[in-house]
């Protein structure tokens, strides 16, 4: 039983669920563009997301300040799970990437470079990590579709980036105590702006997402921006951890389900 619980916890903490949500958002973007994602782009998105987030988990084992904290101590003691899933994710992404044009691969390598900066200089990037996360997600979800980059497509990419940033900002509130203990020199958005300003910034991102969705004719985007705003308003220092995980890990798939549920 303990072994089974350990594996369930490994899968949860290894962000398999985030990779599934990334795939859901990729499918949503395809529907907005009138395209159907094939297995190639799906492999890149799912495998790439799984690789990156497990690489971040695997990196923690070399950080003495972070690994000493009880929140990540379990991850450090089971780092081989993250290592295995990281390699599996890389293999899945590589299989899909083999069928993509060179021009698309070059852009994806730019995203990989941004992730490397985030991983290598985690303490130095501080508040910039939120922007890096949003930009990288937007690139990975949209670029594989090989677009001509019309105005609507550019606005869609901006909307996705803001949506991800809006989801990430509340998690900065959730992580502020851990960040202060594990990375005393790192100044995140919450450390620089304060909790209330961070919440307002997150809501501002969702307001812009709603406005861009209105312009692009995406009713589901307007609905999800309102839902996310409601969840963000409930965030504070004592908010249960499950609230943050549902907000971050559930809203991407929820957006796709809302899109499918609408009668048009």
Indicate where each model-derived feature is located.
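Extended hydrophobic alpha-helices typical of membrane-associated regions
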Residues: 69-71, 222-264
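Intramembrane alpha-helical segments
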Residues: 73-146, 232-234
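Solvent-exposed interhelical
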Residues: 45, 49-84, 165-206
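Functional transmembrane core segments of multi-pass inner-membrane proteins
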Residues: 133-178
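Membrane-embedded alpha-helical segments that form the functional core of polytopic membrane enzymes
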Residues: 37-55, 107-113, 152-170
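Helix-coil boundary and interhelical linker segments in multi-pass alpha-helical membrane proteins
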Residues: 24-45, 93-106, 141-158, 210-219, ...
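C-terminal ends of transmembrane helices
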Residues: 5, 53-66, 114-129, 173-178, ...
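Small-residue-rich segments of transmembrane alpha-helices in multi-pass membrane proteins
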Residues: 20-25, 73-85, 131-147, 190-198, ...
């Amino acid at each position: 039983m303990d072994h089974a619980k350990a594996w369930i916890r490994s899968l949860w903490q290894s962000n398999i669920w985030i990779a599934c949500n990334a795939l859901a958002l990729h499918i949503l973007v395809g529907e907005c563009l009138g395209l159907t994602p094939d297995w190639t782009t799906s492999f890149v998105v799912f495998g790439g997301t799984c690789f990156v987030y497990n690489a971040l988990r695997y990196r923690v084992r070399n950080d003495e300040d972070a690994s000493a904290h009880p929140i990540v101590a379990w991850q450090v003691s089971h780092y081989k799970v993250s290592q295995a899933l990281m390699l599996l994710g890389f293999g899945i992404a590589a299989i899909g990437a083999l069928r993509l044009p060179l021009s698309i691969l070059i852009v994806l390598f730019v995203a990989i470079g941004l992730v490397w900066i985030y991983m290598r200089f985690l303490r130095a990037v501080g508040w910039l990590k939120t922007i890096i996360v949003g930009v990288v997600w937007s690139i990975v979800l949209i670029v594989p579709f090989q677009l001509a980059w019309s105005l609507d497509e550019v606005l869609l990419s901006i909307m996705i980036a803001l949506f991800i940033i809006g989801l990430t900002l509340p998690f900065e509130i959730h992580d502020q105590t851990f960040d202060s203990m594990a990375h005393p020199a790192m100044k995140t958005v919450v450390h620089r702006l304060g909790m209330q300003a961070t919440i307002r910034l997150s809501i501002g991102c969702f307001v812009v997402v709603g406005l861009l969705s209105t312009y692009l004719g995406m009713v589901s985007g307007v609905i999800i921006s309102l839902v996310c705003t409601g969840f963000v308003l409930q965030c504070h220092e004592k908010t249960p951890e499950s609230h943050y995980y549902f907000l971050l890990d559930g809203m991407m798939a929820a957006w796709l389900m809302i899109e499918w549920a609408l009668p048009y």
